[in-house]
Amino acid sequence: MKALGYWLMVVGSLRLASVWFGFFNIWALRLAVFSQTTMSEVHGRTFGVWTLLTCTLCFLCAFNLENKPLYLATFLSFIYALGHFLTEYLFYQTMTIANLSTVGFFAGTSIVWMLLEWNSLEQPHSKLS
């Protein structure tokens, strides 16, 4: 397995921990992510379901890095997550810069790494003699 695959499993595991907070410990989720606003339990469960989906993408992609559609969906999940959290910080002020920095580190690293690895997904073309 490539190093990117291991990285995606680490990120997927961290996302899985966030799923727990979304479903069962809304207080911890509020402190860890959305510290500038109130959250209801339905917000936590919605966050948990979204995060479970992105966690699943990370694990599937980690074991199938050569699958371009899956790779692209996983890559876009990082773009969407970073965009969402940037919006929460910049426009709605529901996050602190410290919380955004944590999300930004994992999403940003994943985005850059996946971009760098994108061209290595090309399958060599067989030569016709």
Curated annotation (Swiss-Prot):
Signal peptide region: none
UniProt-listed GO biological process terms: regulation of auxin polar transport; sterol biosynthetic process
InterPro entries recorded: Erg28
A molecular function GO annotation: protein-macromolecule adaptor activity
Keyword vocabulary terms for this entry: Endoplasmic reticulum, Lipid biosynthesis, Lipid metabolism, Membrane, Steroid biosynthesis, Steroid metabolism, Sterol biosynthesis, Sterol metabolism, Transmembrane, Transmembrane helix
Location of this chain's protein in the cell: Endoplasmic reticulum membrane
Transmembrane regions listed in the UniProt entry: 4-24, 46-66, 71-91, 96-116
A GO CC term assigned to this protein in UniProt: endoplasmic reticulum
Topology within the bilayer: Multi-pass membrane protein
Chief localization: endoplasmic reticulum
PANTHER family: ERGOSTEROL BIOSYNTHETIC PROTEIN 28 HOMOLOG, ERGOSTEROL BIOSYNTHETIC PROTEIN 28-RELATED
Annotated family: Belongs to the ERG28 family.
Protein name (database record): Ergosterol biosynthetic protein 28
Lineage: Eukaryota, Viridiplantae, Streptophyta, Embryophyta, Tracheophyta
